[in-house]
Amino acid sequence: FNYNIPGNMFCSVILNYLREIVRDIYKDSYLEERIVDLKFQIDYGIELFGIVHHPQYGKMYAYETDGYGNHVLMDDANVPSLLSLPYLGYCNEDNEIYQNTRRFILSHDNPYYYEGTKAKGIGSPHTWKEYVWPIALTMQALTSNDEQEIQTLIDMIVNNTGDTRYCHESFDVNDDSQYTRPWFC
């Protein structure tokens, strides 16, 4: 669909920074008002079209919407992503809608969540099935309050380099010698 929710959320956060710059440095109240209005419209659109009710997870964020009631429920490994929302500054880790969304995207209900003998995490429609991205594993750790989960994710990243000692774009959850973009580190 045409409206990517994480991208719009990131834009909302950036507009806050831009507003501060325009207000404090450029002292341009007209431009500041336009920024505030645009941010309001984006946030309103997210609230209106980007939050869905899932029968198992409750209120959660969609990944994409068309603005007509249709939506895509998934998450992609790249940033901005739904998983990265607290890191980006859109919400806190304990936000209920975020936590419901997190439970969804870190489950097999997310079509790009993979689990194997070497790793489990979020992959992408841009790489092969059963491949997870270290960037998503890192973001999962950065947005977790669970020390055991964080340590498990760090170990997963360190132990899945295909014996190259480099992080790659993605790697197979069952065989880390199979990876994409060896120059990606």
Segments and roles (model prediction):
Residues 1-12, 25, 31-133:
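Extended ligand-binding clefts on enzyme/binding-domain cores
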Residues 17, 97, 117, 169-170:
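Generic alpha-helix signal with a bias toward terminal, lower-confidence helices
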Residues 19, 23, 34, 102-103, ...:
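Arginine residue identity/basic-tract feature
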